[in-house]
Amino acid sequence: GLRYRAAFSVAYGGGLRASEVTHLKIGDIDSDRMLIRIDQGKGRKDRHVMLSPSLLVLLRDYYREARPAGWLFPGRNRVDPISTRQFNRAFGVACDFAEIKKRVSPHTLRHSFATHLLEGGTDIRVIQVLLGHAKLETTTIYTKVAIKTIRDVTSPLDLLVRREAGAG
């Protein structure tokens, strides 16, 4: 449903850990500054991540439908946030529905966020801050994934040589 689509979109759109998504409060969404506040993430540090315009639209649709109070993604009793276990289970169901055969978890969304930013040319130090990593070494794990993609890219030189060979 819309609730989980919104929650998974927050995880990917902001590079959040599952526990960070489940513990978001409505007040953590700052639509004026287009930021999401992560309160006491891993390492007991607060940080901000970007709030994309498309994510804001999705969150507003979700808010209008669900009318959450307090927690952005409340649990069944609405007093507590959705549990990380429930979030993980819903992710598994969504992956089965999408017929994703690869072994993935909500953390894959965070990994994809970092990898896609890196592949898009975002400085690794910016990615480090967005992910809330204390050490750059932790963030460099994502460069290994990006290197696989780099190998698949055709060099402009090869494209030029092919074009010249075809014109010859």
PLM features per residue range, with description:
Residues G1-G168:
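Conserved catalytic core of the tyrosine transesterase superfamily
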